[in-house]
A protein has these predicted regions:
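C-terminal accessory regions
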Residues: 115-246
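Conserved helicase/translocase motor-coupling segment
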Residues: 2-153, 205-208
């Protein structure tokens, strides 16, 4: 990212004590939170028109890789979209995940690929962009990590990363044990939302930290600025308050 102070702010965002240092970096690095995915895309495209060609759209692992079987540089016309999100005015915002054939296709827009034709045509995952920077980044912040009454939670169900399967199972088993012992109320089949910072639930905290780290990676890929679509209204309001210094 283009500002050390901003990186420090991101490091503190997913904690119980977020930094209040926005005034130190807001003139060096642009952060904008929007209400719809199309608003995010439009903002990033405006930067491209202005001459900043190195722009990408990113997301954490909230969606399955439905298009994984399509291994050609160009997605098949009838391939299922990985991202199919409700947008303004009853419309849908749709995209594919990055092509799994190699980092160069997404990062460099190499070959006869969708990314060569349009740098915003695919959504990049944390693995594909780790270690790479872009002028501007658009982020899809969906259902996997969110705020309730000022406290962080992580969703077990809305996480499609294969590497976290064991972590998700441990967090779920931890909740089941707590329900059996009547430490908490709930139904086994409904287990999903787990607290990020409850000392009674270390497995939940470990899962939260893994997901939060993915967001730290995504939110620090931009050199000049990031535009964030946050699906959850309460989380969106929380981040906006922090950006406003409240």
């Amino acid at each position: 990212a283009g500002s050390k102070e901003y990186v420090d702010w991101i490091d503190g965002l997913f904690t119980e004590n977020p930094l209040k240092n926005v005034t130190k970096w807001k003139d060096k690095f642009k952060v904008k939170v929007v209400d719809y995915p199309s608003d995010m895309e439009a903002d990033i495209r405006a930067q491209m028109v202005g001459g900043d060609k190195s722009c990408r759209i990113l997301s954490s692992y909230t969606r399955k890789w439905e298009s994984m079987s399509n291994l050609a540089p160009l997605h098949d016309a009838d391939a299922d979209f990985d991202f199919d999100l409700a947008d303004k005015n009853g419309k849908r915002w749709q995209r594919y995940w990055n092509n799994p054939n190699g980092y160069a296709i997404y990062v460099q827009g190499a070959g006869n690929s969708m990314m060569h034709q349009d740098p915003l045509s695919e959504v990049g995952c944390p693995y594909v962009v780790r270690g790479f920077d872009f002028d501007y980044v658009g982020l899809l912040w969906l259902e996997d990590i969110y705020v309730r009454n000022g406290k962080w939670y992580v969703s077990i169900k809305h996480n499609e990363e294969t590497a976290t399967a064991s972590s998700r199972k441990r967090a779920r088993d931890e909740q089941k044990e707590a329900i059996r012992n009547k430490f908490i109320k709930g139904k086994m089949k409904d287990i999903d939302e787990v607290p990020g910072f409850d000392p009674r639930f270390p497995a939940a905290h470990a899962l939260f930290e893994t997901v939060a780290q993915a967001y730290r990676i995504l939110l620090t890929r931009a050199i000049k600025g990031v535009t964030i679509y946050i699906k959850d209204e309460e989380t969106r309001a929380y981040v906006r308050e922090l950006l406003n210094g409240e």
